[in-house]
Amino acid sequence: MLPAAVCGQTLDECQVAAEQNYPLIKQYGLMAQTTEMTLSNIQKGWLPQISAMVQATYQSDVTAWPSQMQSMYSQMGLQMEGLRKDQYRLGIDVAQTVYDGGIIRGQKDVSREQGRVDEARMAVTLYDVRRRVNEMYFSLLLLGEQLKLNEDLTRVLAANEKKLESMSLRGTASEADYKAIRAERLTVEQQTESLQSQHRTLCDVLSAFCGIAVSAPTKPAACEALPAVPELHPEMKAADAQLRLADAQKRLLDARMMPKLSVFASAFYGYPGYNMFDDMMRHRWSLNGMIGARLTWNIGALYTRKADRAKIALQRSMIENMREVFLFNNRLQQLRQNRNIARYRKLMATDDEIVNLRQSVRKAAESKLAHGITDVNDLMKEIHSENVARLQQSIHEIEMLKELYDLKLSTNN
């Protein structure tokens, strides 16, 4: 169910409503939550890493006393069995990172920049929503103007039809002339019905797109395009976000080359323990533990470092190229739009005069018909010429406004 229509929806209102109604807008909140959860998970890398372990093994061989020592112990009355081949261990290990070389910070930076890239790409899509609104909005305005002109044309034809009917009854005009202009009026009314159907359909489509009931769009005022600000365009912001992501990935790559320092503690209950000699003499479970510090350096990261850096450099080059392509196409688009605006303004400069002249010619034809100097075909020709002139005047105005507001989008103003 769409909200109730308000009188005179403006272009800005429709654009804002369309953005808020577009399903993709919901992803803004979802993206923010996803990024926040990812950052929270990465930050947990500073928490102690705890692992529990249960182990049971049977070995093919174990540490044993030399045979000479076993003989000596036997002579002394001692039974030295040595270690058993079945061994058991229940343990827990705790490790705490002290210095990770900047990996966690780098991962958080990459996650943040990835979130910004996703948001920037979505902003580009939402910016295109405004262009789609422009297309429908100005098409609706043009249909509205055509309906008004058809109504005016119907009134003119109806007035002349009435005159010809009267003249036909008096015998000063033929019945065929009356029927011809009546048929023309009915044809125009059919066209009006078709235009009204198109108008209703486009209203419904724009209403569904914006999420509000659009029935009476107002003609926007002619605006002057401000100087272009390309760096603020969503496409440029998306490219900047991708470049920052590439920089963050490069920093993370460097961080993976740094040594890492951690402290750890390990404890287990089982057999054998750390006191090997005691366990060789007595087969019993014992509690054992140790603490320490560990410095590690993953030299294996060197294997792919060169290729990884080259890949990031290529990504940056591709992004820069995309920026250049966008700026090139955007400049061409602005050039075309400015030329079209200038063309429509030049045409509009003489539209009023053409309409006035066509109106004068049409009125003269009506007078000639009343005095029997011309026929109805000449009159209908002049009526249509006047209507075409008025239609062209409306088209020039609406198309110029559309080009102005499309240029406003192109220049991000």
List where the protein language model places each region.
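Periplasmic alpha-helical coiled-coil/stalk elements that build and connect Gram-negative outer-membrane
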Residues: 13, 37, 122-237, 244, ...
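Sec/SRP-type N-terminal targeting helices
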Residues: 26-30, 43-44, 98-126, 176, ...
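Surface-exposed, polar helix/loop patches in the mature regions of secreted/periplasmic/lumenal proteins
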Residues: 80-148
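Bacterial Sec-pathway N-terminal export signals of envelope proteins
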Residues: 6-51, 55-61, 172-174, 207-249, ...
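Short segments within alpha-helical structural elements
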Residues: 184-212, 356-413
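Small/polar, glycine/serine/threonine/aspartate-rich low-complexity segments that form flexible
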Residues: 53-93, 264-297
